[in-house]
């Protein structure tokens, strides 16, 4: 399983005032808020953690069928600005984020080894949905292949896992 998320930092800055009263309390656990306050660039940390939660939520939703808005149930632990984990209930997701070209891009997987199997999807590839969950058709096997799609502002990314 794979999930991804992308944040256009310019758009996030324009549309979301993360410093407003109680914003952090509604989205981030106490532990995550400490990471934000202690960060060299708190704004980048806000969107880095948000991106990790969103990418992990996509896997959680696909695995459990549970949809909803519960960011406080997804808790990030950060090894560094690139690698970390997100935990929800008894599930752990591994995340890898990169910050470049005005965006934060995160991929989440259920096994660390899956980072080696990531394949980017060409935006021209036809993407289908079943119950709101995206997939592509693998033309070699004619089988459905799960994908994760994310877009925000100027950015779009799609990924799947190589067999």
Ranges and model annotations:
Residues 1-163:
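Core catalytic alpha/beta fold that binds nucleotide/phospho-ligands
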């Amino acid at each position: 399983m794979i999930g991804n998320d992308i944040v256009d930092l310019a758009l996030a800055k324009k549309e979301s005032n993360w410093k407003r009263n109680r914003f952090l309390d509604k989205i981030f656990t106490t532990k995550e808020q400490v990471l934000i306050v202690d960060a060299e660039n708190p704004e980048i940390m806000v969107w880095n953690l948000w991106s990790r939660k969103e990418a992990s939520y996509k896997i959680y939703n696909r695995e459990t069928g549970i949809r909803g808005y519960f960011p406080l149930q997804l808790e990030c632990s950060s090894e560094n600005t690139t690698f970390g984990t997100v935990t929800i209930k008894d599930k752990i997701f591994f995340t890898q984020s990169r910050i470049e070209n005005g965006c934060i891009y995160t991929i989440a997987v259920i096994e660390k080894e899956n980072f080696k199997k990531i394949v980017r999807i060409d935006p021209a590839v036809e993407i289908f949905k079943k119950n709101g969950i995206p997939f592509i058709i693998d033309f070699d096997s004619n089988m459905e292949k799960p994908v994760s799609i994310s877009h925000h502002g100027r950015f779009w990314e799609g990924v799947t896992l190589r067999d």
